[in-house]
């Protein structure tokens, strides 16, 4: 397993924004499961993923598939009292850092709960005023 993926498996669920940031390429692109937009840049993506780590509970990776630069990491978690499953689709760049990170999840009700919880957290985080240009 690639060292970046191995480390990611340990830090994402903890919401450790600094540790997550160390795994991201400068121009990383992140596609969340809650809307069809893309976050671009190490700082905003680390901030989003840091918040996710605090919204999810009982998070664990179930299966890891991939080799080289392309990886799929299947997970399960809770959002409040709702169960969810998802997959992190990750592409590593030439430097071995995460260049592209896309999350797909189900069921729909859990994704809605994630969106609501994330909106509440992001609205209270003043850094996101500066990150508005990172969303396209």
Regions found by a protein language model. Name each.
Residues 17-19, 23-68:
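A solvent-exposed, acidic/Ser-Thr-rich amphipathic alpha-helical stretch
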Residues 4-7, 19, 44, 110-113, ...:
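Exposed alpha-helical structural elements
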Residues 1-23:
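Short acidic-aromatic low-complexity motifs
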Residues 8, 20-21, 28, 41, ...:
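Hydrophobic pocket/interface hotspot
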Residues 2, 27-29, 80-81:
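Short hydrophobic/aromatic segments of transmembrane alpha-helices and their interfaces
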Residues 53-61, 65-136:
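A beta-strand edge to alpha-helix "cap/lid" segment located at domain peripheries
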